[in-house]
Amino acid sequence: MFNNNLVLYLENQKSQSMKNQIKIFFLLTFLCTSFLFSQSEVKPPKGYSNDIGNMISMLDNLKKRVERHVRNLDQEGTDYLLDENANSPGAIIFHLAATEAYYQVYTFEGRSFNAEERAKWEMALNLGAEARKQFKNKPIKYYMDIYDEVRAKTKALLKTKDDEWFKKKIGSMTNHWAWFHVMEHQANHMGQLALITKRI
């Protein structure tokens, strides 16, 4: 009789444990799914027109994903060159900032870089052999701070515009297409950074 009761008790405990595990599994699944969907929503932040806000949402999402590949790099990783013609992760982040800075003056002021801006951004914009010599021995934070500063300016400038401005043509492209290009440019280099950082 005692043995039967013990068996029944153990089976009941086992069943209860299984039920708890199932509950935990579904709870974790729900939380993970909710997190993934919340991260994947394109939604205009407060203060922006609809189309510009959607672009900001995508730009910022991509920027976070770019930075995920590099934020923990040490100095060796920041300056790492995949081969003699490659660009380092630090240089690529600088390049992303320079490209975005260029499209700021192009879309908001209708011009190219002036002499002072060229001195600041041209090497990072074009990269190449001289950039490989110059862009080293600085921590990844140095480059990420530059990127942050440029993005903050982009967002402040875009907040002053509306979707009618976004549709306007400037040169051979609309303002919308220009900022789409900035976004796809980030995506291109995100893949490059993913490859490079796996080789470090």
Mark where each language-model region is.
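Bacterial Sec-dependent N-terminal signal peptides
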Residues: 1-43
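Glycine-rich, acidic and aromatic/proline-enriched surface loops and short helix-turn segments
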Residues: 98, 152-163
